[in-house]
Amino acid sequence: MSKIKVEELTKIFGKKASKASSLLSQGKSKTDILKETGATIGVNKASFSVEEGEIFVIMGLSGSGKSTLVRLLNRLIEPTSGKIWLDGKELSSLNKKELLEVRRKSMSMVFQNFGLFPNRTINRNVEYGLEIQGMDKEEREKNAAESLALVGLAGYGDQYPSQLSGGMQQRVGLARALANNPDILLMDEAFSALDPLNRKDMQDQLLDLQDKMKKTIIFITHDLDEALRIGDHIMIMRDGSVVQTGSPEEILAHPANEYVEKFIEDVDRSKVYTASNVMIRPEIVNFEKDGPRVALKRMREAGTSSVFVVKRNRELVGIVHAAEVSKLVKENITSLETALHRDVPTTGLDTPLAEIMDTISTTTIPIAVTEDGKLKGIIIRGSVLAALSGNEVNVNA
């Protein structure tokens, strides 16, 4: 079961919402409806689901409806129509008391504007939500201290917001959201006001926290690079409507339409694709106990000049080259040991391409992709170039 499920969620702003809704059902555009009724389509029949423990990024340009949508999820803005389920419970069925409980304990928000109280210390800012809940002083101080430590601000509790940099203030905002241990974090352009260096630091911080805490995070941004860097799934919006939803790799490889194609045209794909996206299955491998004649026969049949050597469980041992193996055959040597090169370039399945581009450009042999020491695939320059140019790589090739 999904943590959050949204079905046909719609928000129309204005007095003629009913007429606007009827025009919307007829397929009228947002602009036409505005001209005819004066009503604004904030969100247009959005449907999606968010799995527990994932970072789900909603992105789009200004006016796309992304910030309205995130406020519909906790009913800070009431939907015109549609359904929202949280852990299988439909939110529109909740009364005011139940909804307040959801906002207090299940969801927390982090905004672009830090929203810190200048007259409160950092500790008291982080404690604020817990104080409103009526938590006793000792427990909320403990929770605040733990949250500040999580975001790297241990020891700053007695300072005031004016004494902290913008990046540090945003960490305080994140700590405040984490203090009541919510299941879900709603982050609306949380890092957009920061300079590029601080923004990257906060992205790293968020990913580190996610490794530890496994929160369900809905992250709003207009920055595609940010979305691709942190998102498990990305939903792109335009004029209140959902244009495409998918993993970063799916969106880059299969853009839904021209709008998405234009959106992603300047993306540095090397920062998004990982080794697993561009590796191919090796045509042949040679087992460690197989001798030079077997290895040479396999290379000749496959038309390759080298072959990786593995144990029976596919644990990588090294690589041998045809010229050196041929020499062993001529000398009637029955072991590959003297021709075996154990120091081969390797990488993990989840390594971003950007981190191995230097190796790819300088090595004369394929890069071995391993998991727990076992050979999973190989990376050749051709597969990398295909991926970076937007062509799909066949991992079974």
Curated annotation (Swiss-Prot):
It is an enzyme of class 7 (translocase). The gene is gbuA. It comes from Listeria monocytogenes serotype 1/2a (strain 10403S). The complex is activated by an osmotic gradient or by low temperature. GO terms for biological process: amino acid transport; carnitine transport; glycine betaine transport; response to cold; response to osmotic stress. Its EC number is 7.6.2.9. It catalyses: a quaternary ammonium(out) + ATP + H2O = a quaternary ammonium(in) + ADP + phosphate + H(+). PROSITE patterns: ABC_TRANSPORTER_1, ABC_TRANSPORTER_2, CBS. Pfam families: ABC_tran, CBS. Belongs to the ABC transporter superfamily. ATP binds at G60, L61, S62, G63, S64, G65, K66, S67. It comes from the Bacteria. The complex is composed of two ATP-binding proteins (GbuA), two transmembrane proteins (GbuB) and a solute-binding protein (GbuC). Part of the ABC transporter complex GbuABC involved in glycine betaine uptake. Responsible for energy coupling to the transport system. Involved, with BetL and OpuC, in osmoprotection and cryoprotection of Listeria. Can also uptake carnitine when carnitine is abundant in the growth medium. Residues 279-335, 340-395 form the CBS domain. GO terms for molecular function: ABC-type glycine betaine transporter activity; ATP binding; ATP hydrolysis activity; carnitine transmembrane transporter activity. InterPro entries: AAA+_ATPase, ABC_osmolyte_uptake_ATP-bind, ABC_transporter-like_ATP-bd, ABC_transporter-like_CS, CBS_dom, CBS_dom_sf, Gly-betaine_transp_ATP-bd, P-loop_NTPase. Disruption phenotype: Mutants are impaired in the transport of glycine betaine at elevated osmolarity and at decreased temperature. Residues 28-264 form the ABC transporter domain. This is Glycine betaine/carnitine transport ATP-binding protein GbuA. Keywords: Amino-acid transport, ATP-binding, CBS domain, Nucleotide-binding, Repeat, Stress response, Translocase, Transport. One of its GO terms (cellular component) is membrane.
